[in-house]
Amino acid sequence: MGKIVALGEVVSDIYRGEKPSEVELPFVARPGGAPANVAVAAARLGSEAAFIGSVGEDLFGNFILRALEIEGVDTSAVRRCDPPTRTSLAFVEITGDGDRSFTFYRSDPAADELLSPEDVSRDTLRGATFVNFGSIPLIKDPARSAIHRAAELAGELEVPVAFDVNFREHLWESVEAAQEVVEPLIERSRIVKLSDDEISPLLGTEDAAEAARMLLDRGVSLVFVSLGPEGAFYATEEFEGDVPSYPVQIVDATGAGDAFLAAALVYLSEDEWDEETIREAARRGTAAGALACTEYGAMGALPTEDELERFTNGG
């Protein structure tokens, strides 16, 4: 099943609890953050998984680390930050259709922003099938330099980079600033995954095939575009196609894209990248993404290998 190494942000997602009153508003904390979600999703699917990141020496940092360790994720490369630096909190609001919005509460700097190049070691990346990261750590240093260090080491070790863009426009000074920082990492990536709402601001098109062609022209080998309820699109230099979604009752879409990517990467760890294999990777990705939407929290409904097999086979 290979080894997936994910690095970047990890946060505590905060959801409203049950039975609020006029004088009490209960909340439930759940671990989150795209790279951490990918690591957990990969581990549940039977892959070896490691996470490189930074959390506070606080209640939420302890909670997140314990959750990752219970899932079988190697956390030996996670930095702990002393106060006043804290683990970031993301308050999640869920709409009626399962979509969500986030309000972040962070110290300045936040623990996840202090991931540094020194935290990214050759030993952690050695033997990996894929190295995965997104764009949020690229917003500022030292986390930005840590991502570049990971990409550099991955190149030296011949480990493919899987870049899940995960673009959050409100976190950047401008779209242009994001494009300038993201571009060099795209050029170092073998796989790039985006959602359909990210291709327009970053690539200037709303067409998935056109966006994929632009990325392939920059040296990317494989592009995935997740299309929400429409499924997913995939493309290489030789072929392209799409797979349908799996209908489910959506409770919370948080982590669906991370589940998609993890399932695809785990499957691609085992086989040559011919058209049949890539199509199956996309199909399994859409299935994992659908299952991830059926419970609250980014990690709550991430499927095991057996659960994914039963679901895709109609069981």
Name each region found by the language model:
Residues 1-74, 95:
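Glycine-rich phosphate/adenosyl-contacting loop at the front of the ribokinase-like
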Residues 1-5, 152-153, 204-315:
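Conserved phosphate-binding/catalytic region of the ribokinase-like
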Residues 6-7, 77, 161-163, 193-194, ...:
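General beta-strand structural signal in soluble alpha/beta enzymes
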Residues 10, 165, 259:
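Active-site metal-binding loops of divalent metal-dependent hydrolases
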Residues 40, 89-93, 231-234:
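Short beta-strand scaffold segments in enzyme catalytic cores
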Residues 48-133, 310-315:
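Conserved N-terminal subdomain of the carbohydrate kinase-like
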Residues 133-213, 230-231:
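Conserved beta-alpha-beta core of the PfkB/ribokinase-like small-molecule kinase fold
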